[in-house]
Amino acid sequence: MNPLICAASVVGAGLAIGLGAIGPGIGQGTAAGQAVEGIARQPEAEGKIRGTLLLSLAFMEALTIYGLVVALALMFANPFVS
């Protein structure tokens, strides 16, 4: 097993999960802040805003899970290691 391939796999896995979590994390914070602001402006629309927020948070979290899957594949099911 080539140590350079192993090192590149570890770095790639770290980048996959790190960069895969940074964007959705920022997006989730922004979405939650805007939802709180929307509920403060229109308290009667709380249910609709909350439902839309939860759906959008689930879609954003899926991106992080995809990054985790790529990282796990690079660590444990690496196609480059024979």
UniProtKB/Swiss-Prot annotation:
It is a multi-pass membrane protein. The record marks E61 as: Reversibly protonated during proton transport. Signal peptide: none annotated. It comes from the Eukaryota. The keyword Hydrolase does not apply. Pfam families: ATP-synt_C. NCBIfam families: ATP_synt_c (TIGR01260), PRK07354.1 (NF005608). F(1)F(0) ATP synthase produces ATP from ADP in the presence of a proton or sodium gradient. F-type ATPases consist of two structural domains, F(1) containing the extramembraneous catalytic core and F(0) containing the membrane proton channel, linked together by a central stalk and a peripheral stalk. During catalysis, ATP synthesis in the catalytic domain of F(1) is coupled via a rotary mechanism of the central stalk subunits to proton translocation. Key component of the F(0) channel; it plays a direct role in translocation across the membrane. A homomeric c-ring of between 10-14 subunits forms the central stalk rotor element with the F(1) delta and epsilon subunits. Belongs to the ATPase C chain family. This is ATP synthase subunit c, chloroplastic. The lineage of its organism: Eukaryota, Viridiplantae, Chlorophyta, Mamiellophyceae, Mamiellales. The gene is atpH.
